């Protein structure tokens, strides 16, 4: 079914006409552009969330200014469960307040079927911690920490069938002395090739090079050592397969603009895992709504847009300007994203973005009248010329709530007027009434005992300490195993 938005549009005889913007195929992906204050979220993103819940979509929502979008999704779901055959469950990831957050392990071993999954997870984490690395793929000091952390993730996946395969355990294991972690990991045949560059440097006595490789992974990841973050990412209260027909989910993941540097990598890991898990056949229709896209890096986003249509995944990306996308996703990947999206909404944008959009909307044959006056007479000439349908100057001067854009159609659902220049009309009074009845996202984990004492801080700290003890025990047990195995004990002699 189409996602609909009321509009007013000047299309004939210089008159405004009431009508609708019909997104008949949201699975061809959508982009919402506009400078801050242009009305992206209020006019478009919020409508997407509400209408897709009404139409029975499973959903993943990245909420940069948590809990703005999450509150809308939570309350709209409460009032529109009738759109689903199996009622979905509502889940929240929130690092700021563990009591209002579910716990989810993005490195769940059930979804880590190959070492390439470990590499993709590591890659996503590293690029969210070091955004400039996106343009340096293949460089020595980009690949080294990525491969090292991927090897650690896969070691934890194969160790005791993934019992300790979590992001916090991986960070703690990385921070153990390399004289301990390299013998342990190299005792596993599936990791030998991954670790060979590090082992070669170790055996050659290139300690400075080795320490540099390890430090390039340790230093950025040290920013993420947080008891609250460890709490949320170290247990499995739900899985990330949001479009599972038997267990549909509405998942909201919240960021905090003040802690973006810390939370960005963890959230990027969730995003990358979700993008891969949901893009499969035989699942429920689902939506991935990411407002303020440049605040995170999502590996595989271009591939998702290109392939999601056949798997019924509707992608909506919100950001301010194409230059943001080019800066954070490299020029090549940004162009793929821009050119493969079927539906586009744009509020006020300027510069190259306005020019690009104007070119996308095309040109139209327009009549021009010219009048020439001289002493004897007045002559009038009429000519035709191809001019921009919506010139860049008009896009640069759009007022708040005014949008230009285009929509894609389907076989059997033809749209003659694909391009629009309109005011998206939002019933502000109705929305205000809805918001008065909104409920807050409830407390999910109760840390308060019967006497009213809040134990959140100590329970979160206990979990943090337990993870550190888990890793100490893993290292001790593995070193003991290697020392007692005649075929492996030579690995410990490499330290001498």
State what each model feature region is.
Residues 415-419:
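Extended, low-structure N-terminal and interdomain regions
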Residues 13-14, 21-313, 329, 395-399, ...:
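P-loop NTPase motor domains
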